[in-house]
């Protein structure tokens, strides 16, 4: 197994709240990889907080989005730790005998609704049956043709996880399999307690990039080129200095 890899069955050890956080972190990483702010991902972080059928909500202010894992700019993820057969899917999508208002709203605005089931590991036939169950629930909705529906099982979830090594590091740490010397994204600057942790952008603090021919950039002007360099290069990237 590669150093940054994980077996899909290891994810079964995640709790409900950890599963929800995993999906949120993956959604943040996914839209960030496509040039959008992680701030467009919303989640409660608590399974006890009223959520109206929403565990993780992606709302990117663009007309279209298709990344392979997120197919609409407005996407709702519903996290489920246990298997979701047809009856469970129907129960999840129906409220008081009618289609959940949350799902109906997604259909009205052409959004996406995705159930993520950690307890399922589907064959193609099993996934097809679950998608059919989801589509059957919305049969009577006038906007049923507008909504994008999907069902992520454990294999799909780990496939997504493998695309984002930083989230993989977090997941491995949660499972007690962290790597010595490796840390996921976090507040590394470790500011004194009570102080404001802001980006250093004072005059005189500059960044020089290999492709910049010695040009000195202010930090706020260098962030975009640095991100592009990290995305495009096949070489190791090391940031030195303060």
Map each language-model feature to its residues.
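Mixed-charge (Asp/Glu-Lys/Arg
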Residues: 1-241
């Amino acid at each position: 197994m590669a150093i940054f890899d994980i077996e899909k069955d290891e994810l079964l050890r995640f709790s409900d709240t950890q599963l929800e956080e995993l999906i949120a972190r993956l959604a943040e990483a996914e839209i960030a990889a496509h040039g959008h702010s992680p701030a467009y991902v919303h989640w409660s972080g608590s399974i006890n907080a009223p959520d109206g059928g929403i565990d993780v909500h992606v709302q990117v202010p663009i007309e279209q989005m298709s990344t392979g894992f997120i197919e609409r700019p407005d996407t709702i993820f519903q996290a489920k730790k246990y298997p979701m057969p047809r009856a469970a899917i129907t129960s999840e999508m129906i409220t008081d005998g009618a289609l959940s208002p949350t799902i109906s709203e997604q259909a009205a605005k052409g959004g996406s609704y995705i159930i993520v089931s950690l307890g399922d590991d589907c064959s193609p036939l099993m996934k097809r049956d679950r998608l059919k169950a989801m589509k059957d629930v919305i049969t009577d909705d006038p906007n049923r043709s507008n909504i994008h529906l999907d069902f992520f099982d454990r294999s799909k979830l780990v496939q997504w996880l493998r695309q984002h090594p930083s989230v993989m590091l977090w997941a491995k740490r949660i499972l007690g399999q962290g790597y010595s010397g490796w840390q996921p994204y976090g507040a590394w600057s470790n500011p004194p307690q009570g102080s404001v942790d802001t980006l250093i952008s004072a005059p005189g603090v500059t960044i020089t990039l290999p492709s910049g021919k010695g040009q000195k950039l202010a930090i706020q002007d260098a962030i975009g080129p640095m991100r592009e360099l990290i995305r495009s290069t096949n070489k190791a990237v090391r940031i030195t200095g303060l």
